[in-house]
Amino acid sequence: MTDSTIRIAIVGAGGRMGRQLIQAVTQMEGVVLGAAIERKGSTLVGSDAGELAGVGLLNVIVGDDLSQLTDNFDVLIDFTRPEGTLEHLAICRQHRKAMVIGTTGFDEAGKAAISEAAADIGIVFAANFSVGVNVVLKLLEKAAKVMGDYTDIEIIEAHHRHKVDAPSGTALAMGEAIADAMGRSLKDCAVYSREGYTGERKPGTIGFATVRAGDIVGEHTAMFADIGERVEITHKATSRMTFAHGAVKSTIWLGKHDNGLFDMRDVLNLNEL
């Protein structure tokens, strides 16, 4: 990729996040919308992507076959579902198109496929593209190194009623940031549910609690609780536009990298702090 204008493709263009992404592209310099894709059979196929997103005519017609549109974009933004994202990943890898992936809920095989594809194309893969959330992840690393060994750690997350995976990708990223800072593996210390007679809390575990209700965009709190005090680090999103802007910024940053697997901490240079 060159330093010229980045042409962006958006899959799931007619969804809540897809429309916000189209809006974000039109609001930022250095990028243009090159393609918009919806699932086969969608009534939105054939419509203008700009009119669909409420930003006016863009002369980009919504298609239903990514493989036929690869000449129209440099970077694909994908906030869909794991099975769809992996199909799109194969197409992008074949045609050497970079990807920004905000899809959550991948199993280990899916994550491995993304890592393998990054040998050939540039990929920014993040559970959350908000600047604030990624600052929180850095703060959690610092807090875990100081307090993690002697406090009870709980992560509470809340999202809208339509979210299909739990815990959220961001909640898991918070857990991984904490566990990594403590030299542990999250899979060995996570507790994802409690019901009935559970006995006392086991030391060294990281608990998760999930809320699904109404139109909550996204709220996450990590709690470090001791006797007599607790520290809570919280992020609340009130608009999906914060995620959309972060994803679009990632496409510009990714233009400097022909291949490799990155996350938002790379994009924001947080790893240097």
UniProtKB/Swiss-Prot annotation:
Assembly information from the UniProt record: Homotetramer.
PANTHER family: 4-HYDROXY-TETRAHYDRODIPICOLINATE REDUCTASE 1, CHLOROPLASTIC-RELATED (PTHR20836:SF0), DIHYDRODIPICOLINATE REDUCTASE (PTHR20836)
Organism: Yersinia pseudotuberculosis serotype O:1b (strain IP 31758)
Function as written in the Swiss-Prot or TrEMBL entry: Catalyzes the conversion of 4-hydroxy-tetrahydrodipicolinate (HTPA) to tetrahydrodipicolinate.
Amino-acid positions noted as binding (S)-2,3,4,5-tetrahydrodipicolinate in the UniProt annotation, renumbered to this chain: 160, 169-170
Family as reported in the entry's similarity comment: Belongs to the DapB family.
Residues annotated to bind NADP(+): 39
GO biological process: diaminopimelate biosynthetic process; lysine biosynthetic process via diaminopimelate
Xref: Gene3D superfamilies: Dihydrodipicolinate Reductase, domain 2 (3.30.360.10), NAD(P)-binding Rossmann-like Domain (3.40.50.720)
Enzyme Commission number(s) from the entry: 1.17.1.8
InterPro entries: DapB_C, DapB_N, DapB_N_CS, DHDPR_bac, NAD(P)-bd_dom_sf
Keyword Lipid metabolism in record: no
Active-site residues per Swiss-Prot or TrEMBL entry: 159, 163
Protein's name in the database: 4-hydroxy-tetrahydrodipicolinate reductase
Pathway the protein takes part in: Amino-acid biosynthesis; L-lysine biosynthesis via DAP pathway; (S)-tetrahydrodipicolinate from L-aspartate: step 4/4
Any one of the GO CC terms: cytosol
Membrane-spanning ranges: none
Molecular function GO labels: 4-hydroxy-tetrahydrodipicolinate reductase; NAD binding; NADP binding; oxidoreductase activity, acting on CH or CH2 groups, NAD or NADP as acceptor
Residues annotated as binding NAD(+): 12-17, 38, 102-104, 126-129
SUPFAM superfamilies: Glyceraldehyde-3-phosphate dehydrogenase-like, C-terminal domain (SSF55347), NAD(P)-binding Rossmann-fold domains (SSF51735)
Gene: dapB
Keywords: Amino-acid biosynthesis, Cytoplasm, Diaminopimelate biosynthesis, Lysine biosynthesis, NAD, NADP, Oxidoreductase
A Pfam family per the record: DapB_C
Location within or outside the cell: Cytoplasm
